[in-house]
Amino acid sequence: MLKELRIKNFKGWKDTGTIRMAPISLFFGANSSGKSSIGHFLMMLKQTVESPDRKAVFYPGGKNTAVQLGSYKEIVFHRDPKNKISFDYCWELAETLKVKDPISDMIFSGNALAFQAEVGLDKKDQQTLILDRLNYEMLENDEKSLAIGMRRKSENRLDYIVESVRYKLKRKQGRAWYPAATVRFYGFPDEVVAYHQNADFVQELNLNHEKLFRSICYLGPLRTKAERLYSWAGNEPESVGYSGESTVAAILAARKRKISLGYKKTAKPFEEIIALKLQEMGLIEKFKVNPISEQ
């Protein structure tokens, strides 16, 4: 779960300041005060994590995504391409993360991770989006156990320097190569592991970051128009979709699932519960599903 969030130079925000997050966080303000931008930013990061393009620093969205934010110039503060979007957040881990240095045999542990990054346009062409730096901190009860990150070696090149605090990285013998492009906005590339003797744990950091954003869900109105006919090929969708486009498939996939509506109450089939709730809302009189083919 996110504990803190801070965003700089995103849409109408020069600096949000540190926002403390809770299981339920509510934002109040006048129209166009920037409330929605905070959610849009998180959804953009989620879309980027889930995007198949590992080299895309940000994925602002497309036809079937929660948000469509446009180009970098449309999302950066004051639409000034010289501004860089920076952000940091901290989140609790479901399980304690332990890192053992195979060289020193020291063990580092943490129950939370903090992340910072800065993104901007390449100074050469003012078109290419580039990650200038990223940094992870592993925290144990709010105390830093270790930190590791990457920053660009030069503004004119895409080579990165890997730096660490409280954890001594040891390079493998041979020429001192530098890692190239990062994985999206958050990920250490494979070269970091390949060039060092004790950097395997960075893959765990990548994985925990992806788990964080997979746990963040977009809640919004279902706006897909109802259709007369729906086809279902037996697939089991992960959700109903951002616009409800997979609602029918989700219902059909859960036909054999039973849910209890309370303590010591009989579990009922998923379809029956849907029908019951729709009737309680006065939206239907009858709910029935008949297969038109054996599948």
Region spans (language model):
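Phosphate-coordinating catalytic segments in nucleotide- and nucleic-acid-processing enzymes
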Residues: 49-295
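Pre-Walker A-like glycine/lysine-rich segment at the N-terminus of P-loop NTPase domains
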Residues: 1-66, 71
